[in-house]
Amino acid sequence: MINLRKTHPLLKIINHSFIDLPAPSNISAWWNFGSLLGICLIIQILTGLFLAMHYTSDTLTAFSSVAHICRDVNHGWLLRNLHANGASMFFMCLFLHVGRGIYYGSYLYKETWNIGVILLLTVMATAFVGYVLPWGQMSFWGATVITNLLSTIPYIGTTLAEWIWGGFAVDKATLTRFFAFHFILPFIITALAVVHLLFLHETGSNNPSGINPDSDKIPFHPYYTIKDALGLMLLLLMLLLLALFSPDLLGDPDNFSPANPLNTPPHIKPEWYFLFAYAILRSIPNKLGGVLALLASILILLIIPLLHTANQRSMMFRPISQTLFWILTANLITLTWIGGQPVEQPFIIIGQLAPMLYFLLILVLMPFAGLFENYMLEPEW
């Protein structure tokens, strides 16, 4: 009998992607995050779909519709908690996935990497518009502050900001269009994720050693399906612990108050996963300069392949680059902490030094470390 999964036009694609896919035999748990991000996306789309059935995108009823979901809808509280904390798990996996890519030199698959950066930006946009929907105090003021940054663009800035708002301030029109964007963007993310996989399967996976693994491949199923299943169990365990025991741990208490344009919260701050970028934005005492630094902090990922100077792909055998990588990690954690602090000393000076170190590490120190390691490995030395 002909094996259907190898001949059927649709099943054949699935077979070549998840079953008979030749995978390197030595990829570690750091390679689990791709599949975990796929699971996160599915969870977010499903919980979001059911939430959208009960949510109303109107300034008068948005806040009360979220309260209604939590109080009156069957398991509505669970859907909302899974969706809100699912976003946190999504970003946790995203940051680890990007970190893995930088550490092991996966960015040298340039097409896959560039699509990945576009995916990251799209997910960030989705999370931002989604945060506005409950129409709490921090939702409203977060939307006001961030969309206001568009006004820094020369000549067209103010017009552009008002066009996005659909008026002269964040209001009903803004909320309605943000809901529309929040609904459509996850499907765009799904399409981009398929393209991301398409480019990945053109080259095959990288591996911890950074050496061409063609001489030693194993089938994806059952080896990596079972490994991904373990990752999935741990992800679900963490998500359920968060959503069931401390669902509001990562949220902002200000969002329990309905949006009030006449009352500004003392400290406006985004969700934890944007704090590193927010700290970079605040570090420059100039509106346009801050916006450019904010953009540069994310878009710098696009030029990382051009800054690769080492003869080895992975950092596995490069201790100096490893040290700088972990300093960069500590620096990002510091930025996340600073982004949530009030604008006063000593946070101001730390918040100005940390972004300088961030750009210095990526643009100067890490490329020079690669060159120095090449020099140290020369046999004549």
UniProtKB/Swiss-Prot annotation:
Gene3D superfamilies in the record: Cytochrome Bc1 Complex, Chain C (1.20.810.10)
Residues that hold heme b b566 according to the record: 97, 196
Cell location: Mitochondrion inner membrane
Cofactor annotation remark: Binds 2 heme b groups non-covalently.
GO-annotated cellular components: mitochondrial inner membrane; respiratory chain complex III
GO terms of biological process kind: mitochondrial electron transport, ubiquinol to cytochrome c
Keyword field contains Membrane: yes
Membrane topology: Multi-pass membrane protein
General function of this protein: Component of the ubiquinol-cytochrome c reductase complex (complex III or cytochrome b-c1 complex) that is part of the mitochondrial respiratory chain. The b-c1 complex mediates electron transfer from ubiquinol to cytochrome c. Contributes to the generation of a proton gradient across the mitochondrial membrane that is then used for ATP synthesis.
Record note on quaternary structure: The cytochrome bc1 complex contains 11 subunits: 3 respiratory subunits (MT-CYB, CYC1 and UQCRFS1), 2 core proteins (UQCRC1 and UQCRC2) and 6 low-molecular weight proteins (UQCRH/QCR6, UQCRB/QCR7, UQCRQ/QCR8, UQCR10/QCR9, UQCR11/QCR10 and a cleavage product of UQCRFS1). This cytochrome bc1 complex then forms a dimer.
Protein name from the UniProt record: Cytochrome b
